[in-house]
């Protein structure tokens, strides 16, 4: 068994990132209570396995395209057979669902996300207008999952909302970058439908995320240290975005997309600081 190939199939780095997102969100929601550590370790494992399931499914359904565009991937390179990939992907999904039974609400959300991942891989990768929304939800859901695991979703809801809208904006920008390839593959996306106007739709979603990011301070959950850091993050968001508005191009779209992903990590740090220094 080629472990490296299976790690590549599930996209190990993405699975670890998602798992740690749930873990950190749960720690914030529990005010870093030691007793929350065990359910959060379980939450980490659930998110890791369900994310791995989704990533594996993407490779299974993309086999025809990957034979041409990405022949080095585990399945087209025949390091993993298609049958073995299917057995493996559904096995880790089952493992994830079994572990999620430690909390009925975690179990229900794990089932929901597994279904969404299945539908996305099978149907909505070609329809990015809906697909982007699903990816945004899935990204944000890891944070609310951590809150559910410790029985407190108040802060996690803010993290979920900010992450969902900022990632939704990012997905549209990525589509703007990929517009030529998507046209060839007959994929529907907002940039294909609306051209440069789609950048303003993306900006609108980002502004919603920015507006929501102030709520933890305005509602008294976090204090001035959170506010200062979130202000810096939001200014960085806007500065990068206006560069794209002033000079829309594939290169600038790629840069803006990377910036949003990076700054979202700083937003998570702002939530950590806010929860520690109230």
UniProtKB/Swiss-Prot annotation:
Chief subcellular site?
A: membrane
TM region positions: 12-32, 34-54, 92-112, 129-149, 199-219, 221-241, 257-277
Q: What is this protein called?
A: Digeranylgeranylglyceryl phosphate synthase
Which InterPro entries does this entry report, sorted A to Z? DGGGP_synth, Prenyltransferase_related, UbiA_prenyltransferase, UbiA_sf
Q: Which UniProt keywords apply?
A: Cell membrane, Lipid biosynthesis, Lipid metabolism, Magnesium, Membrane, Phospholipid biosynthesis, Phospholipid metabolism, Transferase, Transmembrane, Transmembrane helix
Q: What does this protein do?
A: Prenyltransferase that catalyzes the transfer of the geranylgeranyl moiety of geranylgeranyl diphosphate (GGPP) to the C2 hydroxyl of (S)-3-O-geranylgeranylglyceryl phosphate (GGGP). This reaction is the second ether-bond-formation step in the biosynthesis of archaeal membrane lipids.
Among the GO biological process terms of this entry, one is: glycerophospholipid biosynthetic process
Look up the record and report any one GO term of the cellular component aspect.
plasma membrane
Q: Which family does it belong to?
A: Belongs to the UbiA prenyltransferase family. DGGGP synthase subfamily.
Q: What kind of membrane protein is this, topologically?
A: Multi-pass membrane protein
Report the locations given in the UniProt record.
Cell membrane
Per the UniProt entry, what species is this protein from, by scientific name?
Answer: Methanococcus vannielii (strain ATCC 35089 / DSM 1224 / JCM 13029 / OCM 148 / SB)
Look up keyword Cell membrane and say if it applies. yes
The record ties this protein, via HAMAP family, to: DGGGP_synth
